[in-house]
Amino acid sequence: MEVSTDQPRWVSHHHPAVLNGQHPDSHHPTLGHTYMDPTQYPLAEEVDVLFNIDGQGNPVPPYYGNSVRATVQRYPTAHHGSQVCRPPLLHGSLPWLDGSKALSSHHSASPWNLSPFSKTSIHHSSPGPLSVYPPASSSTLSAGHSSPHLFTFPPTPPKDVSPDPSISTPGSTGSTRQDEKECIKYQVSLADTMKLESSHSRSSMASLGGATSSAHHPITTYPPYVPEYSSGLFPPSSLLGGSPTGFGCKSRPKARSSTEGRECVNCGATSTPLWRRDGTGHYLCNACGLYHKMNGQNRPLIKPKRRLSAARRAGTSCANCQTTTTTLWRRNANGDPVCNACGLYYKLHNINRPLTMKKEGIQTRNRKMSSKSKKCKKVHDNLEDFPKSSSFNPAALSRHMSSISHISPFSHSSHMLTTPTPMHPPSSLSFGPHHPSSMVTAMG
């Protein structure tokens, strides 16, 4: 290897720890290597602090923490400020890399071949343009990453970085400052991009709560109105004294349809659940229409006498009162048939029922009301006794919202709440026995 006269003498020296056979890219025919003079190497203490290796290139355990290493790396030393050896570009086949853009190398066997502190460059015979300044992500990688691959390619092509000053004017101070400004500008634009991405993610989460956000104001604001509560928070129309439809039963019958001028031609009814017509087209109520459809004749207006099941037996009479009609035939202790009234009386009092208590008619009960109807009636009566005035007044509403605010999945973040809760509730309000963390979250 011949060294030209205009090149510095340290280019011809080879460091023992960085050999051509040990370099990961030594198999590439187009890549050349230039090395630093041993007198320009960093001190052993600085190498230990910065890169976790000793002066011979062997890895050692870190002596200082990452914070100390980041502090030391922020300020360059005066020993190796201008001498830097940069390997050439790996491949030129990347689609967004051209000759006018600057880029730092991705692979480096020795960590001090790429230094983020050098401000001047050395012109040497390299097949491609190089950059003194690493990408914006190198400042974070060099502080906490001890791998030899200190810098990586940026995710997008750097559009604002100026060409390498080593190609145009190697010793110009003005171009160096211009590159420094451009590098800072690129880093600021990258930081703005990261802020925009984070603000987009926040705005997508905030849209679930009905609020919008922008890149400059990531904290959501309260909407100008209180959104309508869903059916999961309040029972539907039960607090307002309406029909308790949420309990799964009907407390009142179906609404009867009544049209002006309509009247059943059979019974004269003016309201019915469903109006029907007979064969001639006249209106019939639902009952008369069904009766006519099933029996083929008009529904009788007088109710027929109720037939008593097992009321009449041929030749059967009560052994006590001699009646022949009853709802249920029983037997006394002797085995004789008795009517239902005499049998129950004897069962309760152990004496025969007196004849003075005999009645001509049979008193029956209305057993049509089922147990479900009774339950629905009780629930409806309890809801009517609920005070309507305290349903949606501000005190009751704020108390209800503070007690159920821990149900919301976004209640852990104060700016994600869709409705504002009072910061200091009135002293007359009393909170239920909730968990302390949920109360703190509700108070916001």
UniProtKB/Swiss-Prot annotation:
InterPro entries registered for this protein in UniProt: TF_GATA-2/3, Transcription_factor_GATA, Znf_GATA, Znf_NHR/GATA
SUPFAM superfamilies: Glucocorticoid receptor-like (DNA-binding domain) (SSF57716)
Subcellular location(s) of the protein: Nucleus
Biased composition (Polar residues): 201-215
Tissue specificity note: Expressed only in definitive (adult) erythrocytes within the red cell lineage, and is also abundantly expressed in T-lymphocytes and brain.
One Gene Ontology MF term: zinc ion binding
Parts forming coiled coils: none
GO cellular component terms, semicolon-separated: chromatin; nucleoplasm; nucleus
Region annotation Disordered: where it falls in the sequence: 1-29, 123-181, 195-215, 362-390, 413-444
Domain of life: Eukaryota
ZnF GATA-type: positions: 264-288, 318-342
One Pfam family cited in the UniProt record for this chain: GATA
GO biological process, one term: thymus development
Entry keywords, A to Z: Activator, DNA-binding, Metal-binding, Nucleus, Repeat, Transcription, Transcription regulation, Zinc, Zinc-finger
Biased composition (Basic residues): 365-378
Biased composition (Low complexity): 137-147, 163-176, 413-430
Domain text: Binds DNA via the 2 GATA-type zinc fingers.
Protein's job: Transcriptional activator which probably serves as a general switch factor for cell-specific development. It binds to DNA sites with the consensus sequence 5'-[AT]GATA[AG]-3' within regulatory regions of genes.
Listed name of the protein: GATA-binding factor 3
Organism of this sequence: Gallus gallus (Chicken)
Recorded name of the encoding gene: GATA3
